[in-house]
Amino acid sequence: MXNIRKSHPLIKIINSSFIDLPAPSNISAWWNFGSLLGICLALQILTGLFLAMHYTSDTATAFSSVTHICRDVNYGWILRYLHANGASMFFICLYLHVGRGLYYGSYLFKETWNMGVILLFAVMATAFMGYVLPWGQMSFWGATVITNLLSAVPYIGTDLVEWIWGGFSVDKATLTRFFAFHFVLPFIISALVMVHLLFLHETGSNNPTGIPSDMDMIPFHPYYTIKDILGLFLMILALLSLVLFSPDMLGDPDNYTPANPLSTPPHIKPEWYFLFAXAILRSIPNKLGGVLALVLSILILIIIPLLHTSKQRSMTFRPLSQCLFWLLTADLLTLTWIGGQPVEHPYVIIGQLASILYFMIIIVIMPLASLTENYLLKW
């Protein structure tokens, strides 16, 4: 009798994806983040679903409904903070996952990589719209500032902004549609994740050496299932520590003040995971230029496979490229710090230099360093 795991039309898909999947024998803990992202997505959909049962997307009651969830709904407070801090864990895992792809040359799986960039955009859009829903000061003004950037689009800009707002300012219509999109996007993301995995399983996983590992594969279960469970426990530990000990550490105190269109907060800034983009946006003293730089700071990931000039895939044996990779990491951390600072000297110039360096490292310095390494190895 055939094994149901290998014969059932539905179960055999799961089997070939998570159980009998051949995986390289030497993939490190940096390969854990894919599964962690899947768990983050499931957690966000689950907590979000229960929050949506009690939330009202109306400007008059949105803020009160969030307060009601935290005060009156059974375990509503933990749902709300798991959802808010779960987003932070999601982005930590996302950035580490992308960083892993850059370091080990995983971007040469072009379909998987491009799908990943689309996923990154979708998750960022979802997180932005979710931040608007509690209808606090930072929600309202963040929505106003970011949607207003679209007015920089030549000719159709103003019409575009008013179309997205559903009126002449961020108001009732905006909140309702943002809630609708915020609810539906995670399900679209789930479908895109399936496509991402489909493309990945066409080629199989990369590994730290960057050398094809077809001759040395092991089954995903039990080796990597147990390894992923360890990663999961560590992530849950970090998330619960955050939720139970300092749930507001990563939030903005301004968001505990109900939205007021007549009073602008002194510093309008996004959540920490968008600060690097905010710093790049405001380092250019021109609206359209800033918006282009903002979009390109993420869209640049699409062209990274074209900028790969090294004869080696991974950075494991390339010290020069390694130094530049960690310089890029430090540069992004600098941009994140600058994004949270007021627009004054010396933060402005630091932000501008860090922004220039960010694009220079990716477009010019790294490809040149790779060519240099090829030359030094007489390739």
From Swiss-Prot:
Membrane topology: Multi-pass membrane protein
Membrane-spanning intervals of the chain: 33-53, 77-98, 113-133, 178-198, 226-246, 288-308, 320-340, 347-367
Matching SUPFAM superfamilies: a domain/subunit of cytochrome bc1 complex (Ubiquinol-cytochrome c reductase), Transmembrane di-heme cytochromes
InterPro entries per record: Cyt_b/b6_C, Cyt_b/b6_C_sf, Cyt_b/b6_N, Cytb/b6-like_sf, Cytochrome_b, Cytochrome_b_C_euk/bac, Cytochrome_b_N_euk/bac, Di-haem_cyt_TM
Gene3D superfamilies referenced in this protein's UniProt entry, alphabetically: Cytochrome Bc1 Complex, Chain C
Key words, A-Z: Electron transport, Heme, Iron, Membrane, Metal-binding, Mitochondrion, Mitochondrion inner membrane, Respiratory chain, Transmembrane, Transmembrane helix, Transport, Ubiquinone
Annotated GO biological process: mitochondrial electron transport, ubiquinol to cytochrome c
Cofactor stoichiometry and binding remark: Binds 2 heme b groups non-covalently.
Domain of life: Eukaryota
Subcellular location: Mitochondrion inner membrane
Homology family: Belongs to the cytochrome b family.
Assembly, per entry: The cytochrome bc1 complex contains 11 subunits: 3 respiratory subunits (MT-CYB, CYC1 and UQCRFS1), 2 core proteins (UQCRC1 and UQCRC2) and 6 low-molecular weight proteins (UQCRH/QCR6, UQCRB/QCR7, UQCRQ/QCR8, UQCR10/QCR9, UQCR11/QCR10 and a cleavage product of UQCRFS1). This cytochrome bc1 complex then forms a dimer.
Protein name: Cytochrome b
